[in-house]
Structures are given as structure tokens and as C-alpha cells.
Swiss-Prot record:
It is found in: Secreted, Cell wall. Residues 349-392 have a biased composition (Low complexity). This is Cell wall protein IFF11. Residues 349-397 are annotated as: Disordered. Disruption phenotype: Leads to hypersensitivity to cell wall-damaging agents and highly attenuated in a murine model of systemic infection. InterPro entries: Flocculin_t3_rpt, Hyphal-reg_cell_wall_N. GO terms for cellular component: cell surface; extracellular region; fungal-type cell wall. The keyword Iron does not apply.
Length: 511
């Protein structure tokens, strides 16, 4: 009996409850998302977008199927993207994009999981320069068969770390670096490629951690560089397309010194094998397989002053001529460009509005507006479902197209009627009209936003709702002019500002 009493609690503590958020048709969330939903699975060619959801603390697995897309974008604040669970997995077969080029502060991408597997396309794009991002993708099982692109618009001192320190990453695809410094802290196995574009640098910081001899470092356009730790037992690293008339540099973390007495030179090139050997202090070195056809007279010892790299005087070598066998190896995929994320814009027009609000015991309500517009730009159509997302009976999510017409006004006349008495009041106000189209069915939402904090717009039941004005056209959680929402489900008041009336046609859906 005593044993059974002990075993049952132990078994109970091992039980876990998991949930999955399945996206089977395109969905966009603006400003907020509940990351407590657990695992996220994007399927059936769907796309899932999180726009201006600044603190993305994922709490489950991520699975992106083939032909699906997951977009996380920040157009204002710094984006904080975190996975901090050594039991979770990330598997991408489609396209995953993190876009922070418009952020006003440095962003963070800190991924610590059990398994990271990419057979699709991943693009992590950052502003860079003085806004140096933190980039870390650590997993005990780290495999890339697709393309992983780490992109900075302007190079910064940011150092990208891939894998667990002292562990192993497996790369059979392409890791693209654009204006990015990456520090090797693991073994690298596989016959894949690391492509260095523009001002990128790769630092082989621990030469005792082997890099597969069939793995390729590709030096692309711009002035990319490679720097390796000099050791007494050198490796041979395969480098493609070295040259670019002196723009490319390969070096060590120590000066390339020649010791005349010992007959040791700081560098040598074997015209029969295509091996370039760099030597520091005459005894410790590294070897680079750059290929055949180079003219030894065109090599020159130089200094690598790349941003983020420890500058070593006379620690590198360049080739003052084009690569004799220039070109991108077939193993190195073309680095994908950074797409432009969806943005929300609005146009302003001058109008005069009149609102009529009637409250009776049955809580019926109506609204009528008239407007005179000036010659301003037409409203912009954006794609989002954060304002009013719909859930279909089978649990999938539908695509929503929203037309937002943001207008301004000087005076609104409000007439509140109850107990056979009506009381007109006036107040400055703003008006936003939202047309939501989902599966060819439209919902029109009109938002009135008084510019005073003390105007009472109406009575719903026995509640008096005192409405203020949200900051900008979009309020908390992405809702336009949140506050009182009246639809087929009745009226509901919130503690925030704005007045919202919905002419709901979704009889069988839920917001």
C-alpha cells in the first residue's frame, strides 16, 4: 500500500498537457498573439503572419509544411524572438521569414531547442549598423538541407552563433551570410556550402573542431573575408571563387611572418595541388584549397579590417586578379532576397458625421453617417485578420481582406435616447470604416472615436460606457477603435477607448 501511494503521485507528475495551433488557410495577426497555444503547425499551402508582435516567446514546436509560409515582421519596435526549451523542435519545409529591417532598435533572435531541421528556406533579416542584432540558433540536433540566410542591411558587430558550443552542425544545403559575421563554435559535417556575400566574415575560432573537407566556403560579390585560428595541426578548408581583384581576403588570427633563418615563409601556394598555406610564426598554420590556376606573383599579404573581425596587422592575404575559375559552385544555392512585409497605411479625408444612438429595453441600435470628402488619396487595402479573424467549424482559419478608410472630422452630433427622452450632445470625433471580406462575405465595421475623454456615447442595458480615444487609428491588440462592439451576439463594453458597431453577416462564425 505504501509503495502504491508513492508510485501514483510520481506517475501523475510525469503527465503533460499539450496543445496545437493548426493553420490550414492564410492568417495574419496584428500586434498580439497568444503564444501559450503550444505547438504551431502551418499546413495545406497556408501562410501565417505575425505583424508588429514584438515579444515572440514561443512555447512549443514549430512545423512549417512544404509550400507554406511563416512571416514574423516588426515595423517599429525591436523584435524579440525566443525559443527557450531544450525539449522542443523546429522543422521547416516551406519558408520562414523574420523581417526587422524597419525596426527602430536592435532585435533578438535567440533559438535554443532540441532539434532544428531546415529543408526549406529561412530568412532572418535585420537592420544592423548601430542596431546590432543578437543571433543564436542552438540545437543538439542541427541539420540544414535547404537555405538559411542571415541578412543585415548594414554590417554591425553582431556575431551569429550556429549550433551548441563544442557540438556538431550538419549542413548539406546553403548557409548564406550577407553583411554578417559568423563565428564557428562547432564541428561542421556535410558537403554543403557557406556563402559569404558583401561584407560578410566567417571566423573559424576553434580549429580543433573539424570542418568537413568537402564543405565549401564561397566568396561572393563585395569584400567578404575568412579568418582562421592558426594551429600546429592544420586543416584544409575548401574555398571557392577567391580573388575578385583583391576584394577577397583569407587570413589567420596571427600575423603571417616569414622566418628567413628557418626557411619559413608567411604563405605559399602549390601550383600542382591548388593549396594555399598561411603560416604564423613559422610553425603554426592553416591550409585552404582555393583551386588551380593562380599566379603566385599576384598574392599579397595585407590586413583585414572588416567590422567585427579582430584586426591582425599583416594577418591576411589577397589575390590581385580575378579568380581563374570564377563562378558559384552548384552546391551553393543562390541566396534568396528579403521580401517586403505587409504594411498598414491609411489615408485622411475631411468629413462631417452625424451619429444617432437609440437605446431601449431591447437594446436595439442603429447608426447613420453622412460625409463630404475632400480630394485626398483613396483608402489603402491591406490583408490582415487581426481586426476580425474568423474560425470555421472545422477549426481552420480563413483569409481576410480588410479595407480601412481612416477619416477625420471636427464635430459629431450624438443623440442618446432612453425613457422617452433624447439628449443631443456634440463632440469632436474621428471615424474609421472597415470593410472585412472573408470568403466573399463582407462585414462592415464603423468606428467612432471621440477626441475627448468625458463624452458618454450611449447606454447598453444598465451600463453607461464612458469612451475615450485610442492613440492612432489602431488600438491595443490590433483592433480599430476598440470599445463597444455591437453585432449579432449583442453588445459588449471594454475598458478601452473607441466606439465600434458591426453589421455582422457571419452568422455561424465567431470572432
Amino acid at each position: 500500500m505504501l509503495l502504491s501511494n508513492l508510485v501514483i503521485p510520481l506517475l501523475a507528475t510525469s503527465a503533460t498537457v499539450s496543445a496545437t495551433f493548426d493553420v490550414t488557410s492564410s492568417l495574419t495577426k496584428y500586434a498580439a498573439f497568444d503564444f501559450g497555444v503550444g505547438d504551431i503547425s502551418i499546413q495545406k499551402s497556408a501562410s501565417f503572419s505575425l505583424i508588429n508582435t514584438f515579444d515572440c516567446a514561443f512555447q512549443g514546436d514549430i512545423n512549417i509544411e512544404k509550400d507554406c509560409e511563416f512571416l514574423i515582421a516588426s515595423t517599429a519596435k525591436a523584435l524579440k524572438l525566443t525559443f527557450n526549451n531544450i525539449f522542443h523542435k523546429i522543422e521547416n519545409k516551406g519558408k520562414w521569414i523574420v523581417h526587422t529591417l524597419e525596426s527602430a532598435a536592435a532585435s533578438t533572435c535567440n533559438i535554443i531547442v532540441k532539434s532544428f531541421v531546415n529543408t526549406g528556406e529561412i530568412i532572418l533579416a535585420f537592420k544592423g549598423h548601430v542596431l546590432a542584432p543578437i543571433i543564436n540558433i542552438a540545437a543538439s540536433h542541427w541539420v540544414n538541407h535547404g537555405c538559411l540566410h542571415l541578412f543585415q542591411e548594414i554590417k554591425s558587430i553582431s556575431v551569429a552563433i550556429l549550433g551548441v558550443v563544442g557540438g556538431t552542425i550538419e549542413n548539406h544545403g546553403t548557409i548564406c551570410l550577407t553583411n554578417q559575421l559568423c563565428k564557428q563554435v562547432t564541428k561542421i559535417i556535410g558537403s554543403g556550402c557557406i556563402a559569404l556575400e558583401k561584407s560578410s566574415s566567417f571566423f573559424i575560432s576553434n580549429s580543433f573542431l573539424s570542418i568537413d573537407a568537402q564543405h565549401t566556403f564561397y566568396l561572393g560579390e563585395g569584400n567578404p573575408t575568412i579568418q582562421a585560428q592558426a594551429v600546429s595541426l592544420p586543416q584544409t578548408f575548401k574555398v571557392a571563387n577567391f580573388g575578385a581583384n583583391g576584394s577577397h581576403k583569407i587570413g589567420l588570427n596571427l600575423p603571417l611572418l616569414s622566418i628567413t633563418i628557418a626557411g619559413k615563409k608567411g604563405w605559399s601556394y602549390d601550383t600542382k595541388t591548388g593549396i594555399l598555406t598561411l603560416t604564423a610564426n613559422g610553425f603554426i598554420s592553416q591550409k585552404f584549397d582555393i583551386g588551380l590556376g593562380y599566379d603566385p606573383s599576384k598574392f599579397e599579404v595585407c590586413t583585414d579590417n572588416s567590422v567585427g573581425i579582430v584586426s591582425v596587422i599583416k594577418g591576411s592575404i589577397k589575390y590581385n586578379g580575378p579568380c581563374p575559375h570564377a563562378g558559384r559552385p552548384s552546391v551553393c544555392q543562390i541566396c534568396p532576397g528579403v521580401p517586403t512585409p505587409p504594411v498598414i497605411t491609411s489615408s485622411a479625408t475631411a468629413i462631417t458625421s452625424t451619429q444617432s444612438k437609440t437605446t431601449s429595453s431591447s437594446s436595439t441600435s442603429s447608426i447613420a453617417t453622412t460625409s463630404t470628402t475632400s480630394s485626398k488619396p483613396k483608402p489603402t487595402t491591406v490583408s490582415t485578420s487581426s481586426i476580425a479573424s474568423t474560425t470555421t467549424p472545422d477549426g481552420s482559419y480563413s483569409t481576410s481582406f480588410v479595407t480601412v478608410t481612416a477619416e477625420t472630422t471636427k464635430v459629431v452630433t450624438i443623440t442618446s435616447c432612453s425613457n422617452n427622452a433624447c439628449h443631443p450632445t456634440t463632440a469632436p470625433t474621428g471615424l474609421t470604416v472597415v470593410t472585412l471580406t472573408t470568403s466573399d462575405v463582407k462585414t462592415v465595421v464603423t468606428t467612432y472615436c471621440p477626441l475627448t475623454q468625458t463624452v458618454t456615447l450611449g447606454v447598453t442595458g444598465t451600463k453607461t460606457v464612458d469612451l475615450g480615444c485610442p492613440t492612432g487609428y489602431f488600438g491595443y491588440n490590433g483592433y480599430i477603435g476598440k470599445g463597444v462592439s455591437i453585432g449579432h451576439g449583442g453588445a459588449a463594453a471594454s475598458a478601452s477607448a473607441g466606439f465600434q458597431i458591426g453589421f455582422d453577416i457571419f452568422k455561424n462564425h465567431h470572432f
